[in-house]
Curated annotation (Swiss-Prot):
GO cellular component: endoplasmic reticulum; Golgi lumen
Domain EF-hand: 92-127, 131-166, 232-262, 272-307, 308-343
SMART domains associated with the record: EFh
Glycan-carrying positions: N33
Protein name in UniProt: 45 kDa calcium-binding protein
Role noted for this protein: May regulate calcium-dependent activities in the endoplasmic reticulum lumen or post-ER compartment.
Entry binding sites for Ca(2+) 4: D321, N323, N325, N327, E332
Organism annotation: Danio rerio (Zebrafish)
Residues that, per the record, bind Ca(2+) 1: D105, N107, D109, S111, E116
UniProt xrefs under Pfam families: EF-hand_5 (PF13202), EF-hand_7 (PF13499)
Localization terms from the record: Golgi apparatus lumen
Signal peptide bounds: 1-29
Amino acid sequence: MFNWRRSQLSCLCASTLAVFVMLALNVQGRPANISALKGKQPNSKEDNEILPPDHLNGVKMEMDGHLNKDFHQEVFLGKEMEEFEEDSEPRRNRKKLIEIFTKVDINKDRSVSAKEMQRWIMEKTEEHFQEAVRENKLSFRAVDPDGDGLVTWDEYRVKFLASKGLNEKEVAEKIKNNEELKVDEETQEVLESLKDRWFQADNPPADQLLNEEEFLSFLHPEHSRGMLRYMVKEIVRDLDQDGDGKLTLAEFISLPMGTVENQQAQDIDDDWVRERKKEFEEVIDANHDTIVTMEELEEYMDPMNEHNALNEAKQMIAVADENQNHNLELEEILKYSEYFTGSKLMDYARNVHEEF
């Protein structure tokens, strides 16, 4: 289970392990993503919306293999997460957290059980799913200008390159005439990755066209079992250094390329190793055989897996369960508000029972 109160000794162990990994392996950098291209100034808001997001709300791992550091808040707060991010006033956030507690506490016994938390996690995950569906409708319209409900790879490619600053009409004409497109190496690499992903999202019988549902899977692989499997394969491919299609602990915690130049960078590396080691050993490696298979990683990544939701509920409760009764009381959830919401409530203990 996750331990919110980390010991100082774990830092030393993580440092030692990090050094071992760097010496023992030909360490590869963390997998690349399309963030750099997203950082380029888009021509409009729609331009960024046609790119698959690096971050998937309610999914434990990012598209590039990083752990989702906001996962707990996402599955606890759902669409309310933005409200906590935008409003840093402790008293208002405290009131909102109390309101959430009352909603999670279905039987109104003033405590939250693992089953109640599991149900809540599934509800919040579904909220993220529905938000992705709504956003996808707008994104699909942006790449389907003729409104026929189907998008070809070439149509998408035109919109994508236009979002990178190329003239849309010129690009469309060159593609129509099979002329060479001159783009920088980074853009070409992303195009090739997107093309592979595009055809993976094309459900059988393959027609090289994506409808709105398939386009949703293209942007959000968590909505399709097949695309989730594809995402897992991509992550394993980027981390798997010996090519056996599985992940060892050493491969999973491989550090970024580069020499640690200062203490701050060393601390970042220590956190990287410690967090990934814990997640690998205690959560992802379901049968605890020290190897993570694609099947195990796929189960771990599936946001609608009820067994995962129950385990997550138990882990979240364990973080704040100071009286060890396997339930969460209001006082506990307020005290550990930073874990659940990302916001620290300095006055959590004041008048708890009165406001409740």
